[in-house]
């Protein structure tokens, strides 16, 4: 009897910890969504001041994708104990592909431009579309392949090394590189097995 009681206590404590973690996740991702909305407004205002329609469109795509990314994650963590969990978990993972492609959009169409920018833009959005379809249909299967695909998409910018270097300069390119390294480390940590 004592063993059953200990198991029930352990399960109750584990459930409470999971609930607290999911509440914290929902709150932090909700704050991220609010900050992304503020960032979207700032990006649009700055783009409008440049008078460039391409900047307005590309900055809006990036900002809107970031809002959707955090919103999907907030909804997933908020509804984790409901039947809607699976749908929002798939959307949460799909939004990773969307935000990667949207992150490339200003670089491709404002910084690189021309045929190289449009080509990389097409490749990245095709990869994002394929990733979203794959993740939506085969969500539970081969999760490590999704992480590998995320990282490959993230490093596709090496195809446009010189145009990016010339457009961004050493400081801008260094920041892009630092972001890529940080993202890759995050993907590696995410892909590590948990207990």
Region spans (language model):
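Multi-pass alpha-helical transmembrane bundles in non-GPCR membrane proteins
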Residues: 2-195
């Amino acid at each position: 009897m004592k063993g059953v009681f200990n198991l029930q206590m352990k399960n109750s404590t584990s459930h409470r910890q999971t609930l607290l973690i999911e509440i914290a996740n929902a709150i932090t991702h909700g704050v991220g969504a609010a900050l992304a909305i503020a960032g979207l407004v700032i990006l649009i205002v700055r783009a409008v001041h440049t008078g460039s329609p391409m900047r307005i469109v590309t900055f809006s795509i990036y900002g809107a994708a970031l809002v959707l990314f955090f919103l999907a994650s907030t909804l997933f963590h908020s509804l984790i104990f409901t039947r809607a969990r699976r749908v929002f978990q798939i959307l949460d993972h799909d939004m990773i592909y969307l935000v990667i492609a949207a992150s490339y959009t200003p670089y491709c169409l404002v910084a690189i431009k021309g045929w190289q920018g449009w080509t990389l833009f097409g490749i990245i959005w095709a990869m994002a579309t394929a990733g979203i379809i794959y993740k939506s249909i085969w969500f539970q299967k081969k999760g490590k392949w999704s992480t590998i695909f995320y990282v490959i998409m993230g490093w596709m910018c090496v195809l446009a090394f010189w145009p990016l270097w010339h457009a961004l300069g050493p400081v801008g390119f260094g920041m892009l590189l630092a972001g890529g390294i940080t993202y890759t480390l995050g993907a590696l940590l995410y892909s590590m097995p948990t207990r």
